[in-house]
Amino acid sequence: MKKAASTTKRTTSKKPKTEGLGVIGELDRYLFGEGRHYQLYHKLGAHPYTYRGQDGYYFAVWAPHAAAVSLVGDFNAWNPDATPMKPVADSDIYELFVPGLGVGQLYKFAITTHTGTILFKADPYAFSAEYRPGTASVTADIRGFKWNDSKWMESRAGTDPVKAPISIYEVHLGSWKKKNRPEKDGYYTYKEAAAELAAYVKEMGYTHVELMGIAEHPYDGSWGYQVTGYYAPTSRYGTPEEFKYFVNYMHKKGIGVILDWVPAHFPRDAHGLADFDGQALFEYADPRKGEHPDWGTKVFDYEKHEVSNFLIANALYWIEQFHVDGLRVDAVASMLYLDYGRKDGEW
């Protein structure tokens, strides 16, 4: 597969005009610009779509500093010249419909910067990601899962969590238990872990499990705290549907599910969010605010409406689409204090 970044040069030109594909409307663009489009994950990213009678996938990405954007994947031999994307109206969102694509296709966005360099980036809104060390996004369809946790959800809606007793078992699925098998490094799948973990948690008297590092991340040693795929349950343990099975199973056994959530910082990996379109986009441009000295990571630019929208929509995504019962926010202090991890004169 193509590497995550390239130094290929390309002559740039003005953005082409397009009428759009009818997915992202004027209201969507307005709410996104205001930072209030809390279901934006239904619009950006990759989604099954039917256009003019043809089934395929719709792709959309926000890249305001890009000179051009195209889609690459196995379907076009990772050729950045093969499948160009077009901006929606006069916005900074690029879109494309590709007929014939289905679930399980590897893809990235090839973003041409204004210096002519082409960056191969994973989709920030992808629902699924390639198993590491691969770094591509993977087309998925998260619509079809049949939940049967209605009893739990109804009880949750009528309960004040602040007043209810709670006892939490914090667990990292990748190291809690492993199997003696070569496939996927012996990891339990979400489905396999569900039954054993639920039985243990019930036996020990816990009310909730708190899962560490579920969003996609490239480096095992980070335990999931350096995220590159905020909308993708890590493929180490299975698919998005299988993670829904995990949550559903826990709820049926009377166990709540809390996720560790990492909106404080993100890694510098070339395929990820850092310098996404050739410039600081998701991170602060000023390195005094945009770089975390302790962890060597980037700090989200919370002042940008589109970035805060990305994070708020992500929090709601896990709650609405995966029925999780709460989020434990990681590294809050580093988000609150400009001098966090910095010496006098460094901020």
Feature-to-residue mapping (PLM):
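Substrate-binding/active-site clefts of carbohydrate-active enzymes
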Residues: 150-163, 172-347
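Short proline/glycine-enriched turn/loop motifs at strand-loop junctions of beta-rich domains
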Residues: 62-69
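The feature marks proteins involved in alpha-glucan
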Residues: 1-54, 86-170, 175-183, 192
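Structural beta-strand segments of beta-rich domains
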Residues: 55-59
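Short beta-strand elements bearing conserved aromatic residues within extracellular beta-rich modules
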Residues: 69-71, 107
